[in-house]
């Protein structure tokens, strides 16, 4: 039995901890033992349907109460799990079905397990000849024991957030999960007896599926889990649950903390909830903006939020989940560097005066990983030299499944090219500057889109998190860029002119270069991934029409 499954099953039989779901209307607590018994039934149903060792299964379910036993049931059969992209009420089901069929064919899924709120997709999938298994039917089966699993068996195939038309899935093995889970346990100073995890993160994203479902199930940790829709309906539910359950650990992308800060200021008053129990509030999955972190800490202070609770981190699906954590209890550490030297010489030189740039330190590497930074010739850079971050170690995926077949993620020496530009400090802390493919090169300077987007976001009338910088003329001797922003006033010509002018002004103030053009769009126009990241490459048409 793999170390991952052996420990998960053992903890299910021995711990009294569990998972609370159904908040805020019908909270129910399920012990991990109860989840395990449901998983044995689901495994029985899967066996009856012919699912066995080495098979791949897709899952289309919205509620953690069903996703947890379904995932464990799939692993009991020695099969791998893929959380499929979920249709929304606005999704064209015919287009979604075509994209989903691409994924099903690519991964060679043997079946799709389905439940609410996606049962409406059942006939669409069955028409395409897909074996559809309903969670309710699987739960009615007789329970069976798990089959043997090996360290290099596939556990997860995590769809990346690229184009749905040309999908790609990251292969995650039992060995990968065990290694990264144990490393995070150490990095988070986890205490199974005391810690309570609170999360609304989606299970179709690695941070929600691995960090806040698989790992608590593996360690037998106390978990309170709601859905992203619950969070979007009531952002303050997040704070309410931390208060109600004395939550000690949570995680989210930068934008979610910025949103919570706004809601705390506008809709809550001191005494409404107590956030003082929170010791580990991880910020990851997108660039960590020091100003947003500081704003969140300021907004949370009247509610007992401690500044040392915030934990900037670095991670990706290709390393199972996590690469580095800031040290517990240290809070936000800002690396302030000379912005001109960073742009022109690719060197992160500490500075406190003049034109400086503030970057969040993302902490030292977790166990079982090593990192290096290389230049365009593959030469290893010294400390504070800016280049491409490469990673090696046990949590790193063997590779991807693509429409063209398997593509290895590691070179012959085991190094994985992250595509992230950054540097490592003298103390061994990782700092990320941006994505290689998004950086705009003008007159030999590296201009990072996040700087442009942050400047545009300062303009009154621009919706939070809804500004995108788009690289134009990539590869030409002089690249340029344009900016698209969303505003509720997009149909008011006078407001549009004001926003265009002010965005251009703020961008010039920030990066000393004027955008080729600024476009003001209505809400929902800028494409984003399911986890809320900007799709910069998909935004070109917004600024070139």
Swiss-Prot record:
E.C. numbers: 6.2.1.-
One annotated Gene Ontology cellular component of this protein: plasma membrane
UniProt cross-references to Pfam families, sorted A to Z: AMP-binding
InterPro entries: AMP-bd_C_sf, AMP-binding_CS, AMP-dep_synth/lig_dom, ANL_N_sf, FAAL/FAAC
Isoglutamyl lysine isopeptide (Lys-Gln) (interchain with Q-Cter in protein Pup) crosslink residues: 528
GO terms assigned for molecular function: adenylyltransferase activity; ligase activity
PTM entry text: Pupylated at Lys-528 by the prokaryotic ubiquitin-like protein Pup, which probably leads to its degradation by the proteasome.
Keywords per UniProt: Isopeptide bond, Ligase, Ubl conjugation
Phosphoprotein as UniProt keyword: no
BP GO annotations: fatty acid biosynthetic process
Family per similarity comment: Belongs to the ATP-dependent AMP-binding enzyme family.
Name recorded for this polypeptide: Putative ligase MSMEG_5435/MSMEI_5285
Source species of the chain: Mycolicibacterium smegmatis (strain ATCC 700084 / mc(2)155) (Mycobacterium smegmatis)
Lineage, uppermost ranks: Bacteria, Bacillati, Actinomycetota, Actinomycetes, Mycobacteriales
